[in-house]
Design a protein with these regions (language model features):
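Charged, low-complexity intrinsically disordered terminal segments
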Residues: 1-289
Length: 289
């Protein structure tokens, strides 16, 4: 997402505030200020000259980079109501999660969520289930353990699937053919392919009724809620939101597999020792994953 206009003032102010804060933190460390050691390393490298280092390149990746660099972007800006949010856990700020929950509660027909690292909070689980009971269709897309660069996180996140999907068996949801909750896991390959061609999906965006969207760095996991400073933009524009929704359906879901209640039981009862170890160990570390 590319933005311009008054919202940039908030983004720049946030960057400058963060930069000033971390400079202050570094300077407060005295001899443990990492800048001292970076400068010493640079000075040593300057004296010894450039060090020849061997490296391996992947020509396929190089070609992709060249193609992207040569691609001309035809940017068509659209006016949109827009607001920029930042979460700073050290101040117990939860603005982005509030924006997600409020947008889900306000949705009338459809909620589409793509999120790289998904370990749901209780508030999120209950809000999604309440939306389904109002005949809203909710589709959540996240990584599978096979595609996640942090597979343990996906394994822990799977523990929440059953609690979410079971709402589909409630009479209020079953009476709404177009409603209910779906969970999809990114496979990194198209539905008609056998070979994985893509790695971790790193997207973090959501679309509500193809009218309001959230795009940013916020993951639905404990780390984003409790540790990391995250940012996101919330905007209202039907054309732009519809473009995101089309990308979600036509591209992202085509690289993914829908999870069933039977799958969730298999996840819980897995006899794979390595899988179970990762799960139990991950649960111990869930608050910082």
């Amino acid at each position: 997402v590319i933005v311009k206009g008054d919202v940039l003032k908030d983004m720049v102010a946030t960057f400058e505030r963060n930069f000033a804060y971390f400079i202050k933190v570094k300077e407060s460390r005295g001899i443990f200020n990492t800048n001292i050691y970076w400068e010493a390393t640079r000075s040593l490298v300057d004296k010894t000259g450039n060090v020849q280092m061997r490296h391996v390149t992947d020509e396929r990746l190089n070609q992709n980079v060249r193609q992207l660099a040569d691609k001309k972007m035809d940017l068509k800006y659209e006016a949109a109501k827009c607001r920029f949010f930042q979460n700073r856990p050290r101040f117990d700020e939860t603005y982005i999660e509030q924006a997600y929950l409020k947008s889900i509660k306000s949705a009338k027909k459809e909620v589409l969520i793509a999120n790289a690292y998904f370990v749901a909070s209780r508030a999120f689980v209950e809000t999604v289930k309440d939306a389904a009971r109002k005949c809203v269709k909710v589709i959540i897309l996240t990584n599978s353990p096979e595609t996640n660069d942090l597979p343990m996180l996906s394994i822990v996140g799977r523990d929440y699937y059953d609690d979410i999907l079971v709402v589909n068996d409630e009479p209020a949801v079953r009476s709404c053919p177009a409603g209910g909750v779906q969970i999809w896991e990114w496979q990194g390959r198209r539905s008609n392919a056998t070979e994985q061609t893509e790695g971790t999906i790193h997207a973090k965006y959501a679309v509500f009724d193809r009218r309001v969207s959230i795009v940013g760095s916020y993951n639905m996991d404990p780390r984003s809620r409790n540790l990391n400073a995250e940012t996101a933009i919330v905007f209202e524009n039907e054309d732009l939101s519809s473009q995101l929704a089309d990308m979600f359906y036509k591209n992202d879901l085509d690289f993914s597999r829908q999870i069933t209640l039977e799958d969730t039981k298999r996840f819980v009862e897995s006899e794979d020792a390595v899988y179970q170890f990762q799960k139990e160990f991950g649960i111990l570390l869930e608050d910082v994953l």
